[in-house]
Each structure stands twice: as C-alpha cells, then as structure tokens.
C-alpha cells in the first residue's frame, strides 16, 4: 500500500514537471534562438577584429615600446597613447573600424529585435 502511494506521488510529480516543461518550451526555444544570434554576432566581430586592429595600428603609425613591462600602469599608459593618437591626431583611423563594426552588427541587431530578444 505504501509503495502504491509513493508511486502515485512520483507519477503526479512527473506529470506536473512534464506539463511545466512543455509550457516553458517556447520560452526556451526563444532563449536558444537569441543566444544563437548573439553567438554568431560575437564570432563575426571577433573574426573581423584582428585585421581591423592591424589596419588601425598601421593607420595610426603606432609602434609600442618593447620594454613596457608587465605592470598594469605601464599597459594603461600604452593604451592611453594608442587611443590618444587615434582620437586626437588621426580620427579617421578610429572612425573607419567603428563604421565597419556597425555594418557588421546591423543584421544581427535587427534579428535580435525581430525575435524580441532585447529588453526581456
């Protein structure tokens, strides 16, 4: 008799969990679709980053010193010099990669908006 009660309880729990899983299935599918779009966008951006950074360094004509050290502050100064040259001296060098990034990400952002992934 005790075994029957336990079996009934587990059967009811299984039915509740299966019903709950089916109710959340569209939410899960939407979440997976949104993550798939985001992963593709990130992969595309990373794939284009290396040549873009190389072109940016060539455009700015920036040669980092060889003995910058391993400290955080020395690397911060190096990044500051790079951004300062790009922002103040050769602004076109920074604008072109930004425009390229916007062009690259535009279809992914539209897909995210279409699937209602943003703001939920």
Swiss-Prot record:
It comes from the Eukaryota. InterPro entries: ACP53EA. GO terms for cellular component: extracellular space. Keywords: Behavior, Secreted, Signal. Changing residue 27 to V: In strain: ZIM56. Main cells of accessory gland and seminal fluid. GO terms for biological process: sexual reproduction; sperm competition. Changing residue 21 to L: In strain: M47. Changing residue 14 to D: In strain: M47. Residues 1-23 form the signal peptide. Changing residue 70 to K: In strain: M09 and WS9. It is found in: Secreted. Responsible for physiological and behavioral changes in mated female flies. This is Accessory gland protein Acp53Ea. It comes from Drosophila melanogaster.
